[in-house]
A protein has these predicted regions:
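Cysteine-centric segments in proteins
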Residues: 21-232
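Hydrophobic-composition signal
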Residues: 11-14
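Bacterial N-terminal signal peptides that target proteins for export
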Residues: 1-9
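C-terminal motif of bacterial Sec signal peptides marking the signal peptidase cleavage site
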Residues: 16-18
Length: 232
């Protein structure tokens, strides 16, 4: 990797590597709560939470009285049910019970103990980024922020492009954003299906394809805040 890669990209990759090893030293047990607290009071609450459940990885996305769960081989939508503590979601014999940084998943007759993966995007969320995607070989990071546009850093930081944010086009099973600035043309396709980072294995709720000036980049992404534009 070139030595000139920007600190943003390096920080992103280091955070994801940390996520992959989240089952090492156990964090202190938090008080029970409906959802994990944000890293700082000034930051909005995350829209998606990654959990490591032994050999399983999943992403949970709470929405009012239900949760969407994405895993490598399936996607689930579970309604919320009464619980003595935390937030419990259940449909039939399948349930997901979240208590702060820990959760219990019951699936296919098995019970899994889950632990929250540390949030690598707290700083970006605090800056107003609504969606972030990244990929490897070559390393790239894409930030979407309606007020400032789409900012893509790629080729390990050697290249970058910033184009205006345009209204996403939401279609069956995918969202597409196309924009340009007279020099760079960028198209982003977001598919709401489980994705694992190629370097760290960290789980994400979306698979992302970026095309910049005819060149295609593959990776994963996540909506960082609730209330983002439809399709993100």
């Amino acid at each position: 990797m070139p030595r000139s890669a920007p600190s943003l990209l390096l920080l992103c990759l280091l955070c994801l590597v940390a996520c992959a090893g989240a089952d090492g030293e156990a964090p202190s047990s938090p008080e029970d709560g409906d959802r994990p607290d944000p890293p700082a009071a000034s930051n909005p609450r995350p829209a998606a939470f990654a959990f490591a459940c032994g050999e399983l990885a999943l992403v949970a996305m709470p929405e009012d009285d239900l949760v969407q769960i994405r895993m490598p081989d399936r996607a689930l939508t579970l309604p919320q049910v009464p619980a003595a503590s935390g937030a419990k979601y259940q449909r039939g014999e399948v349930s997901f019970w979240s208590k702060g940084e820990e959760a219990t998943l019951v699936l296919d007759g098995r019970e899994y103990a889950c632990r929250l993966v540390p949030d690598p995007f707290a700083e970006a969320r605090g800056r107003g980024i609504v969606f972030r995607a990244l990929g490897q070989e070559p390393g790239w990071v894409l930030d979407l922020e309606p007020a400032t546009g789409l900012h893509l850093v790629y080729d390990y930081g050697e290249q970058e492009a910033t184009v205006p944010f345009t209204v996403p086009v939401v279609g069956p099973g995918r969202t597409r954003i196309e924009s340009g600035n007279g020099r760079d043309e960028v198209a982003v396709v977001i598919e709401p299906r489980f994705c694992a980072d190629a370097m760290s294995g960290a789980p994400f709720p979306a698979t992302v394809t970026v095309t910049v000036n005819g060149r295609t980049l593959q990776g994963c992404g996540a909506r960082l805040v609730p209330g983002a534009p439809p399709g993100l």
